[in-house]
Amino acid sequence: EEVVFTRNSTESMNLIAHSYGLHNVKKGDKIVITVAEHHANLVTWQYVAEQTGATLEYMYLDEHGHLKDGEINKIDENTKIVAFAHVSNVLGMEFPVKELTEKAHSVGAVVVLDGAQSTPHKKIDVQELDCDFFVFSGHKMCASQGIGVLYGKRELLEAMPPFLLGGDMIEYVKEQTATFNELPYKFEAGTPNADGAVSLHAAIDYLESFGMDAIEAYEEELVAYILPKIVALPHVHVIGSQNPKEKHGVIAFTVDDVHPHDVATILDSKGICVRSGHHCAQPLGAFYNVSASTRLSMYLYTRKEDLDAFLEVLKTV
């Protein structure tokens, strides 16, 4: 009853913004996020702020990707929503969930946690995290595209109006009125992505066959193996922390005098797949004065031999 199927994290975030944000935030209120947010957890709150007259306030980071001292105090009695990434999709940094959540709840704010980058890589317990909402996408964790999840505390979901209207989300329809289905069906209008849900179930079983703690430990081992070698290259600059324990399988970097798209193209020509661009986090890039970067991502199928091949090409760029 607390798990709603959606298309992806973006749709989950929009559901929260429209069904909770627009109905519970007003002029004079604050929405607090970090500057590192994916656009799905940023543009949504821009929209809510614009529509309600609320203020959107940012918590800023130091050069290592940690929250600057005192930024948490921006969460005050006027704050209604605190939304942030569990793990940054650019920096790989895990934000201090416990500290931020306790601060938010102490002033009566709800916590929206973007788990798109964390869920594939570490064990997740929403009760332990004590967030009010949690979202993630299946395609980032070996499921097919087009399936996502929204977790919400039942009392919040029950009080929220539907996001999409139509078939399956109704209880009874008359000419002028309609009543809505129980949870979670109230938020699952139309034909569901049954194939996607089955693929997500299979993906979860697959990942749990290894153990999420084992996957997290293996990725940390991979990062510890390759990160110092990248940092040692004088023409390459890693964004954020250089502590392997703080990268969670993601290393974003720039190369002197070479555009990230060109870096990615050169690597691709050698059979190495990376991501280049702003990674749907333009305010973070602007904050660090980096318009784009190349991102190396590791997962349970990555081998040290793959990283060696990556490094040899990177040396020549």
What are these regions (language model features)?
Residues E1-V317:
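Pyridoxal 5′-phosphate
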